[in-house]
Amino acid sequence: MPTHPAARTNSERQNWPREVKARAPQRIFLLSPANASGVRAKMIMSENARFVLARRLRNDGLPLGELFSFVSGLYFRGKLAYARAFASPPGGVPGILVITAGRGLVSPDALMTHDEMAEIADVPVDAGEARYREPLERDAQE
C-alpha cells in the first residue's frame, strides 16, 4: 500500500519531477522549547553525571534535537520525529527550527555544548523577557 505523499521523507521528495514539487505543500516546523532548567536538564548538566549523553555534552557537544529529546523525553522526541517526517520547506529554507531561550531559532542538528545549554537554562521562556524574545524576533525576521 503506497504511503500518503505527505509522509514521504525529504530525500524521496528530492527525486520528484519539478512539476510535482511545484504542487506539493510546503511545511516548516517551529518546535517549542524544552524546559532547560527542569529535572532532566539538571541531571544531564550535572558535573557528576557519568552517562553517555552527559559525557558527550561536556566533551564535544550534542545535537540540539538529541539534547532536548533527553530533557523533554517523549514529548519533544515525538514532535521532532513528526517534523522530520513531514517537513517540506521551500528551497534554501530549513524545514525544522527549534525555539531556544536566548538563542532564537536553532536547527535541531546544531551542536550544543555544556556551556551553551547552561546559557539557555539561564533565560526564562517568557515573551516578556527580552533575552528570550529578542533573539526569536531577530531570527523570525530573517
Give the role of each language-model region.
Residues 2-142:
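Peripheral peptide segments
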